[in-house]
Regions:
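A translation/RNA-centric and nucleic-acid-associated enzymatic feature enriched
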Residues: 313-314, 319-335
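Cytochrome P450 catalytic-core helices
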Residues: 241-248, 252-279, 359-379
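Cytochrome P450 catalytic core segment centered on helix I
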Residues: 175, 184-233
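Cytochrome P450 heme-thiolate "Cys pocket" and heme-binding signature region
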Residues: 338-405, 413-421, 431-433, 439, ...
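Active-site substrate-recognition loop segments, prototypically the cytochrome P450 B′-helix/B-C loop
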Residues: 2-159, 168-186, 190-192, 434-438, ...
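Conserved cytochrome P450 K-helix E-x-x-R motif and the immediately C-terminal K′/meander segment
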Residues: 279-313
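Cytochrome P450
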Residues: 173-177, 264-277, 332-334, 414
């Protein structure tokens, strides 16, 4: 992988789609059909020049073998984005929407060497203390609570009312958040993921996590925050906050996409426009494997910075420039024919590889499996409210994420509605378009419908009122 004298920077031939709109990973064309771009890129080599956002250039690795060589070679490919020359030189717009996912933070995602080992050990050993039985119970309780909010209605957006909220509330549980802090954490993380007033949301997120760390130093519990505090690495408050932010960022968005994409696959069945491997009759485990292969929740990420000019299979990767791994393209590499035929769990790169491989593969899989089984068992007649070909995907270079997942089902009574707990209201404006003008369907009258209005609580406070945890 050392530089070779004859190696030249990769350049796509004129007229190739790589020189046209598909070069940009942030447009609606890419969101609608990313594999068209990956196929075009792959015909020109293991890597391709891309634009992540206006004014933000990078290289995308699209070959499985090349991706492994980058992921497994930290001596030549660093993760510390302070090496990014264009950013240091002021050539990257500071208001770019991709910077929050790329700028340096002192957590185990953006560090190298001994510092990475110290931080990662604290994180992995804290995660290893999670009890799988307790984790499943926590997911089931949160799932029951969320399902109760829409089960009387007969319609729902399973992406925004279920897959998105479940991991947010679960992390409140795993972090040991009191009601008020959990409400603020849920609100701020939702705003950050949705790109709404990000600066204010980031400030609120920092404030509530620092408060949480202070509380857990005084009153530790059986939760990840306390375990990180107690770890022999001796993390400072700022370091604790940064690891918690990393855990939420790396856990919430991918988890909701994994749940949402798998539900789409299973509900689409044999509809035209359904994902390539039809979901009819799939077991949940098979659906998750299919998504990790074909629609990985994080499609392009794991940004590396070559420490010097490096030749990779005939392509020169310039020093101190961002090199991203396309997990989606690497998984669809034609060279993986045998592995793809069996969807071998050991061959796809959805969890990454090398020293930065995802440390939460097992709990993340358990969470998605439990969440999907719970909704399918509780609402057995779920069906898509739109054709599979009509679902929209969120634009952006990093994720493979649905905009919404509208479904219909037979309304039934909420099991905990009599407790007098009112979750944050879902208005028709928040529901996908098919529900706004749809003919009315019979529904069970909520038992709290005639109660006087109460002061609105956040999602986490409302959940705690139900379960008293």
């Amino acid at each position: 992988m050392d530089p070779q004298p004859g190696a030249t920077p990769y350049s796509a031939p004129a007229g190739c789609p790589m020189h046209q709109q598909q070069t940009s990973l942030y447009g609606p064309e890419f969101a609608a059909d990313p594999h068209r771009f990956y196929d075009a890129a792959r015909t020109h080599g293991p890597a391709a020049p891309i634009e992540l956002a206006p004014g933000v250039d990078a290289t995308l690795i699209v070959q499985h073998e090349a991706a492994l060589r980058v992921l497994q070679n930290p001596a030549l490919f660093a993760r510390d984005s302070r090496r990014w020359a264009a950013l240091r030189e002021g050539a990257v717009p500071m208001d770019s929407p991709v910077l929050p996912m790329m700028v340096y933070r002192p957590n185990c995602l953006f560090t190298d060497g001994a510092e990475h080992l110290r931080l990662r050990k604290a994180v992995t050993e804290s995660l290893s203390r999670l009890n799988s039985s307790r984790l499943s119970r926590d997911v089931e309780r949160i799932a029951d609570y969320l399902i109760d909010q829409f089960i009387e209605r007969g319609t729902a957006d399973l992406l925004n009312e279920y897959a998105k909220l479940l991991p947010l509330l679960l992390f409140n549980q795993l972090f040991g958040c009191p009601g008020d802090i959990g409400d603020r954490l849920t609100r701020s993380m939702s705003a950050i993921f949705d790109g709404e007033d990000v600066l204010r949301a980031n400030a609120e997120l920092t404030e509530c996590l620092m408060e949480l760390v202070a509380i857990k130093r005084r009153q530790p519990g059986e939760d990840i925050t306390s375990w990180l505090i107690q770890h022999p690495a001796g993390l400072r408050d700022e370091e604790l906050k940064d690891q918690l932010v990393m855990l939420m960022g790396a856990g919430v968005e991918p988890e909701r996409n994994l749940i949402g994409n798998a539900l789409l696959l299973m509900l689409a069945g044999d509809q035209p426009g359904a994902p390539e491997r039809r979901g009819s009759g799939l077991l949940v485990e098979d659906a998750l494997d299919d998504v990790l292969w074909n629609n990985p929740p994080i499609a392009n990420y794991a940004t590396h910075y070559p420490v010097r000019d490096i030749e990779l299979n005939g392509v020169t990767l310039k020093a101190e420039t961002p090199v991203l791994i396309s997990f989606a393209a690497a998984n669809s590499d034609p060279g993986l024919t045998d592995a793809r035929q069996t969807l071998s769990k050991g061959a796809h790169l959805a969890w990454g590889a090398g020293p930065h491989v995802c440390p939460a593969k097992s709990p993340a899989t358990l969470i998605a499996l439990t969440a999907i089984e719970k909704i399918l068992n509780t609402v057995p007649d779920l069906s898509l409210a739109v054709p599979a070909s009509g679902v929209a995907w969120r634009p952006g270079p990093f994720h493979r994420a649905l905009v919404a997942l509208p479904v219909r089902f037979t309304p039934t009574a909420a099991r905990r509605a009599g407790n007098g707990v009112q979750a944050p209201a879902q208005t028709s404006a928040q529901l996908p378009d098919p529900f706004r003008n749809a003919p009315s369907t019979p529904s069970v009258t909520p038992r709290h419908a005639q109660e006087p209005a109460k002061k609105q609580k956040g999602w986490w406070s409302s959940f705690l009122d139900v379960f008293r945890v």
